[in-house]
């Protein structure tokens, strides 16, 4: 979990911006989307191999 300590004379908007930036760097949003629904291991392997194939040909 990302923590942001609000500094003296810092606006709430800038602290919120720092928090969102920290969350984006940590990949929290992508992790939430990935774990939103259960994905069978076979489907996960299939997606991984398809992504590798796309990277290879592009």
UniProtKB/Swiss-Prot annotation:
GO terms for biological process: translation. Keywords: Ribonucleoprotein, Ribosomal protein. Residues 32-58 are annotated as: Disordered. The keyword Ribonucleoprotein applies. GO terms for cellular component: ribonucleoprotein complex; ribosome. InterPro entries: Ribosomal_bS21 (IPR001911), Ribosomal_bS21_CS (IPR018278), Ribosomal_bS21_sf (IPR038380). It comes from the Bacteria. GO terms for molecular function: structural constituent of ribosome. Residues 43-58 have a biased composition (Basic residues). Gene3D superfamilies: Ribosomal protein S8 (1.20.5.1150). The keyword Ribosomal protein applies. Residues 32-42 have a biased composition (Basic and acidic residues). It holds the Pfam family Ribosomal_S21. Belongs to the bacterial ribosomal protein bS21 family. This is Small ribosomal subunit protein bS21.
